[in-house]
Each structure stands twice: as structure tokens, then as C-alpha cells.
Design a protein with these regions (language model features):
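Single conserved hydrophobic/aromatic residue that forms the stacking wall/gate
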Residues: 1-7
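Extended, H/D-rich, highly charged conserved domains that either
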Residues: 12, 18-20, 365-369, 374-453
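Short helix-loop-beta junction
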Residues: 25-42, 104-107, 184-192, 266, ...
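Active-site rim loops that border cofactor/substrate pockets in soluble metabolic enzymes
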Residues: 29-30, 37-69, 435-490
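Short connector loops at secondary-structure junctions
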Residues: 37-59, 116-123, 194-212, 275-286, ...
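Glycine-rich, anion-gripping cofactor-binding loops and their flanking helix/strand elements
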Residues: 46-92, 205-234, 249, 477-499
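Peripheral docking tails and interdomain loops at the edges
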Residues: 75, 86-160, 165-169, 261, ...
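Long, well-ordered, tryptophan-enriched scaffold segments
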Residues: 294-348
Length: 549
């Protein structure tokens, strides 16, 4: 019927399933039919064709796969057009809208996106639909098939073994203390990795230029850093690669690499390879291997970062001699880098005790007890000073002691995923056992740190026991909540409260869907369980004013 229908027919993708509700879509489907057009939903045609793969994005959701197939179907029919509905603030659709647009553009089709919110005035929508109809009729009359071959695939430049020798690998900033140490660890393995340390307002503007503005703030920051570095002229585009972590979870972070590849293409650097740093086998990168020695050094770097972070925030808040803590911190950063380069296990172990003992000598003025404020939230925003508007510095200036969670805790949380999958879904017991063993090895690595901190008189927060944290949240939410920071974010808040830190700032990017559930969504329940809890959620985005935060 579609092939024989009149040229005025239009295919309208109904958005997400709930967009079929007239109370939500404000009667847009009725408006379309009133213009003499037919309406089809994406699920009515998605089974007719398959989208060409591999796609630029990670196609991990059934609904998203239907969208891409529906867009492909529309591309095959001259008398069909597509209208995509999405809800205002639906960050997940920042991934789908770009990909659907690319598919349609490859067939010479106009992409129309209509954002749905509580406003029900359809005047502007009527104009957009009429414009779409006029464009379709004009295209049909012209019968111009140039460049409409449906080629929307992306040419992924692979980082080869040969590239390892002379390529510079650019890494975006996330956690300044930890990533400076991880840069050293990567260099010892033969990778010429350069950490992009600085972020400015220009970085944000660059990110906004090349990334869908509905994507989350961290994706805008990291992409902006990379493109800004390439445009600076410091790096040869023919000898440069980029690296980005990829968790494989449901968070948009899994698609950061897709965002980056699109930005590279749009900025004129399509031949720069992007390395996926992951341990779940998402992308094969011949020139980058996570060997056991490299993993061990990376974990040591994270442990050093966690320990130095504790030393810095605790002692800086109370030091008698201003600047003494920072000077000692800088000294130990260099020592830790040297041990990561050339040290052995014995030197690493001894350095843990030496760090704590050295910082123990710093005299503190504890005549006035300062309120402790814990920072939790999305993993980049809580550590990245520019990303959170330097909230730690602000709190210290206001007379608070800042407490930041261990980065290693997040790594252990990620390792629990396969264990949870197996316990709830009976997936793969062997992988679950391997994950448990990995967590046990990390606990062994942290043993000296726990012991050294336990001997200190300065009340440091010890490294977390991930299984204990998991148990603390089971009466609040399911441990099946693994997207983004998942149940671990809730557990971090409870851990702080149980350690006498009831004042908590929960930071997240604007429209971070996981944090709506495991962050903001559990605050009321936590307050009911812990009446002394003082939790304040703060959103960050490229345009948020500091005064609002």
C-alpha cells in the first residue's frame, strides 16, 4: 500500500511509545491527518527493512533499532517522510536523533524533530509540517537523485600496531589527580599518551559546536577538549589518535565515542582513530592492548590517586601553615610517578605507608571543627574541577572540609555488574566468578592503604567494601540499577552518612536520566531513613549560571 500511495502521504515516527498518548503528543497525529497526510508509527514498518550496520552509534536498545530501521524504510520510498518526536530533556535521544538524521540525509530526505513539552500550542508545529510537505513535493518534482545513495556508514579508522610507535594519543581530562598518574602508567607501556589538562569556556563552546546540545555536559566537555587540541596546531593530525573510555552500559557514556567520531568528521578530521578503552570487548583495537602488567600499573595509579586525594583534602582544610599540604602533595605526585615508571611491588607497598606518615607530620589547627561535605554524583562531574564549577574550592573557601569518594570504588562497582547479572538473570557463572576474583585482587591491592590509613590519627575515610555498600542499598532500590553510577551512587551517600558526613552534594549533568533514579530519586527515602541527612542535588550544563548552582 505504501508503494502505490499518493505523493502526499507522509510517514510520521510516533516517538517513544508514550508519545502515542494524545495527552502527551497534544494531538499532533490528528494535526498531520488534517493536512491530508497518512500517519504510520515506527513499529509498523521497522520489520520491513534493516538499517545498514555497523552504525556510528552503539545500537544497544530494541526501540532505537526500530527507529533506525524505520528511517531506512523511509529512505527507500519517495512518498514518505519522517517526523521524530522526543520529550524535552530526553538525553537518550541525543544519540538517536543524530543517527536518524544521518540516515535520512543520506537519502536526500529532510529530517524533522519536534520536541514535546507541556506547551500545547501547535501553531509552530503546523508550520514545520507544512514546510516538510512543501520540501517533499519540491524534491519529488525535481527528481534529483544526486548523492542520495543511502551511504550513511562511518569509516572507522583503526589504531594499528604500527601506529603505537609514533602516534600521540590524546586523552581528555576527568579526574586530575588520578589521570596524571594514569598518564605515566600508560607511557611506561609504550603509549605516547598526552593528558589534555586544561578546560576553558572556549572548550565548552567547541563542544557545543560539534556535539548535539541535548547530549550530557561531560560529552560536550571531552569532545570539546579533543577538537580544541586538534585545532590548536600542536598535534599532527596524521600522527594523532584519541582515547576514550567506554563502559558498555546503558548510560550515554557508551556512545561518547560515537559523538567524538561525528565531531571529527564534521571538524575535518575523519582519519583520526579513536581508541575505545574498555574491558568488555566492545571494539577491537589491534594497536592497544590492556595487558596484565599495564592493568596492574593502572590500578596502582588509581590507588595512589585515591590516597593522595584523601591526604590533600583532609590536611588542606586544617593545615596551620598554608601551602604546606600542597607542597607535600606535589612532592609525592612526582615520587609516585617515578615508582610507577621504575619501582617494584616492594617499593610501591612501602610508599603507601610513607605517604600517610609524611602527611601525618603536617600540623593541623583543629580548634574549630569544620563541617564535612561529601561530593557524589556522575563520575566526571564529581572529579572534574571545571565540570563542577570548582565546587570543592568553593566549599573550602566557605570553611568546609571536602570529602571525595575513591575512584577505585567506581571500578569495583563496574566489576560487580556481571555478578549481579548472574544472580538476577542467571547469565554466566564463570564470568561472575572472574569478576568476583578481580574485586578480591583489588581488595588485596588496597590492603596496605587500609592498614596505613587505619593507623593514622586524622580520621580518613577508608577504602570502600563494595559488598557492604551493595547491602546498604537493597532496602532502597534494586542492585539491578546499574546504568551510569547505578546503585553505587546511592551507596556512596549512605556510606558518607554512616561515617558522620551527613552534608552531601549530589552533582550530575542536566537531564542525566540514571541520576534522576539513583540520585535525586532516592534522596527522599534516604532522608526518611537518616533524618540527619542534608543532601542537595546540583545540575550542571554548558549554560547553567554559577549563582544558580
Amino acid at each position: 500500500r505504501v508503494r502505490s500511495s499518493a505523493a502526499s502521504d507522509v510517514y510520521k515516527r510516533q516517538g517513544r511509545p508514550y508519545h502515542s498518548d494524545p495527552e502527551i503528543n497534544h494531538g499532533i497525529d490528528t494535526l498531520i491527518t488534517s493536512l491530508g497526510l497518512c500517519v504510520l508509527t515506527e513499529d509498523s514498518v521497522a520489520n520491513q527493512v534493516e538499517a545498514k550496520r555497523p552504525l556510528r552509534v552503539v545500537d544497544q536498545w530494541v526501540f532505537h533499532a526500530r527507529l533506525y530501521a524505520a528511517a531506512e524504510f523511509v529512505g527507500h520510498h519517495d512518498n514518505l517522510e519522517l517526523i521524530q518526536l522526543n520529550s524535552f530533556g530526553c538525553g537518550v535521544d541525543a544519540v538517536t536523533t543524530d543517527q536518524v538524521e544521518e540516515i535520512l540525509s543520506s537519502y536526500g530526505k529532510m529530517y524533522t524533530l519536534i520536541k514535546i513539552d507541556e506547551v500545547n500550542n501547535l501553531g509552530a508545529v503546523r508550520i514545520r509540517i507544512r514546510s516538510l510537505l512543501a520540501s517533499m513535493n519540491k524534491r519529488l518534482a525535481a527528481k534529483n537523485d544526486e548523492s542520495n545513495d543511502g551511504n550513511y556508514g562511518i569509516n572507522k579508522k583503526i589504531f594499528t600496531k604500527e601506529m603505537k610507535k609514533d602516534y600521540t594519543i590524546l586523552c581528555p581530562q576527568m579526574a586530575p589527580i588520578h589521570f596524571e598518574l594514569l598518564e605515566t602508567a600508560m607511557r611506561t607501556a609504550g603509549y605516547n599518551l598526552v593528558l589534555l589538562r586544561e578546560c576553558t569556556q572556549k572548550t565548552v563552546e567547541t563542544g557545543l559546536k560539534y556535539v548535539n546540545n541535548d547530549a550530557c555536559y561531560p560529552s560536550i566537555l571531552v569532545t570539546g577538549q579533543m577538537i580544541e587540541a586538534l585545532e590548536s596546531g600542536k598535534y599532527d593530525p596524521n600522527k594523532t589518535a584519541l582515547i576514550m573510555s567506554q563502559t558498555g552500559g546503558g548510560c550515554r557514556a557508551t556512545n561518547y565515542i560515537g559523538f567524538i567520531r561525528k565531531a571529527l568528521k564534521d571538524a575535518g578530521y575523519p582519519n583520526i582513530p579513536v581508541i575505545s578503552f574498555n574491558v568488555v570487548g566492545m571494539e577491537k583495537v589491534p594497536g592497544f592492548k590492556l595487558t596484565i602488567p599495564l592493568l596492574e600499573k593502572l590500578l596502582r595509579g588509581v590507588l595512589y590517586g585515591d590516597l593522595l586525594q584523601k591526604m590533600l583534602t583532609k590536611n588542606r582544610a586544617y593545615e596551620k601553615n598554608k601551602g604546606e599540604t600542597q607542597a607535600l602533595f606535589d612532592k609525592w605526585m612526582e615520587k609516585c610517578k617515578e615508582i610507577l615508571k621504575n619501582g617494584n611491588s616492594k617499593e610501591f607497598k612501602q610508599s603507601i605507608y610513607d605517604i600517610v606518615n609524611d602527611f601525618e607530620k603536617i600540623e593541623l589547627d583543629t580548634s574549630i571543627e569544620k563541617p564535612k561535605v561529601g561530593i557524589v554524583g556522575e563520575v566526571l562531574i564529581k572529579y572534574h574541577p571545571f565540570g563542577n564549577n570548582f565546587v570543592a574550592d568553593l566549599l573550602e573557601k566557605e570553611g568546609a572540609e571536602v570529602v571525595l569518594p575513591d575512584f577505585m570504588g567506581f571500578i569495583k562497582f563496574m566489576a560487580t555488574h556481571k555478578v549481579t547479572f548472574n544472580s538476577l538473570l542467571r547469565t554466566n557463572p564463570i564470568v561472575a566468578k572472574i569478576s568476583k576474583a578481580a574485586i578480591s585482587l583489588i581488595d588485596i591491592l588496597e590492603k596496605d592503604s587500609k592498614e596505613a590509613l587505619g593507623k593514622s590519627k586524622k580520621d580518613y575515610l577508608p577504602p570502600c567494601n563494595i559488598w557492604h555498600l551493595e547491602n546498604t542499598v537493597k532496602d532502597i532500590l534494586s542492585i539491578g540499577n546499574q546504568t551510569g553510577e547505578g546503585w553505587f551512587l546511592t551507596a556512596e551517600m549512605i556510606e558518607y552518612i554512616e561515617h558522620g558526613i551527613p552534608n552531601i552534594i549530589c552533582v550530575q549533568p542536566f537531564a542525566c536520566l540514571p541520576n534522576h533514579v539513583v540520585g535525586k530519586g532516592v534522596i527522599k527515602t534516604i532522608r526518611e531513613k537518616y533524618p540527619n541527612a542534608n543532601i542537595s542535588p546540583v545540575d550542571y550544563d554548558p549554560g547553567a549560571s554559577e549563582s544558580n548552582q
